[in-house]
Amino acid sequence: MLEPQENGVIDLPDYEHVEDETFPPFPPPASPERQDGEGTEPDEESGNGAPVRVPPKRTVKRNIPKLDAQRLISERGLPALRHVFDKAKFKGKGHEAEDLKMLIRHMEHWAHRLFPKLQFEDFIDRVEYLGSKKEVQTCLKRIRLDLPILHEDFVSNNDEVAENNEHDVTSTELDPFLTNLSESEMFASELSRSLTEEQQQRIERNKQLALERRQAKLLSNSQTLGNDMLMNTPRAHTVEEVNTDEDQKEESNGLNEDILDNPCNDAIANTLNEEETLLDQSFKNVQQQLDATSRNITEAR
C-alpha cells in the first residue's frame, strides 16, 4: 500500500524513467516451437501436428425426369390411355357438361400419373409439341391398328395363338370326318383342274346348245299359245303342256347322254342340273304370264 503523504497527495512512482521488459515475438502459426496449442490441430493417431487433408465431397448427379417422346410412349403414357375410360360411364344427350367434366378429370389423372411435375395446361402443350415426333406417330398408328405395343401385349397374343393351336389339334383329333371332307374337297378341285381344254370346250358347247333349244321352244310355244287363245280352244293348253313335257324329257335325255360321255361326270352334272332348274323356273314363269293374259282375254269377251 502506498502511504499517503501530506496534503493527501499520494506519492506515485516515476514510471517514465523505468525501462520496459523486452519480450520475443511470437513464432509463426505452423512453427513447431509454439507451445500454446494455437497452431495446427494434433493428429489423433500419430500425435503429431501434421496437417490432415480432408477428402472432397462427392456429389451424385441425378437425372431430372423429362417429358419426352420415350416417356410419352412408355407403359404409363399413350398405351395406358387406351384403358383409362374403360370404367367411365357417360350419360349422353342432355348431360354434355357433366360428361366433359368426367373426361377432363380422367385425363388429368392420367397426366398426373405420367408426369406430376407439370400442370395440366402445360402438360397438354408439351404433348401437342411431342405429337410431331416419329416415335409418337408410330405408337399412335399401332394403337389405331390394334397392334401389340408393350411386352404384355406380345405375351398375350402368343398365349392366344398357342391356345388356338391346341384347340385346332384337339378338334382334329376328336373329329376325323373333317380330314375326310378336306380330302374330298381337294380331290374335287384337282378334278376340275385336270380337265383338258377339249373337255371344257365340249361342256361349253353343250350348255350353249341347251340354251338355244330352250329359247327356240319357248318362242314356238308362245306363238302357238297366242294362236290357240284366238281360236279359244281349251284343248290347246293340254296339247302344249304335253309337248313341253316331251321336249323337256328329250332335252334332259340329251344332256344326260352328253354328261355320260364326259369322264368328270360328278363335277359337271351338278352345274348342268342347276342351270336346268333355273331354265325350268323361268319357263314356268312365262307359262303363268301367258295363262294370265289368256284369262284376261276370255273375261273381256
From Swiss-Prot:
It is found in: Cytoplasm; Nucleus. GO terms for biological process: cell cycle phase transition; cell division; DNA replication checkpoint signaling; mitotic intra-S DNA damage checkpoint signaling; positive regulation of cell population proliferation; regulation of nuclear cell cycle DNA replication; replication fork arrest; replication fork processing. The keyword Cell cycle applies. Residues 67-143 are annotated as: Interaction with TIMELESS. GO terms for molecular function: DNA binding. The modification Phosphoserine is found at S194, S222. Residues 1-61, 240-261 are annotated as: Disordered. Keywords: Cell cycle, Cell division, Cytoplasm, DNA damage, Mitosis, Nucleus, Phosphoprotein. It holds the Pfam family Swi3. The modification Phosphothreonine is found at T233, T244. GO terms for cellular component: chromatin; cytoplasm; nucleoplasm; nucleus; replication fork protection complex. Interacts with TIMELESS (via N-terminus), which impairs TIMELESS self-association. Associates with the MCM2-7 complex. Interacts with RPA2, PRDX2. Plays an important role in the control of DNA replication and the maintenance of replication fork stability. Important for cell survival after DNA damage or replication stress. May be specifically required for the ATR-CHEK1 pathway in the replication checkpoint induced by hydroxyurea or ultraviolet light. Forms a complex with TIMELESS and this complex regulates DNA replication processes under both normal and stress conditions, stabilizes replication forks and influences both CHEK1 phosphorylation and the intra-S phase checkpoint in response to genotoxic stress. Belongs to the CSM3 family. This is TIMELESS-interacting protein. The gene is TIPIN.
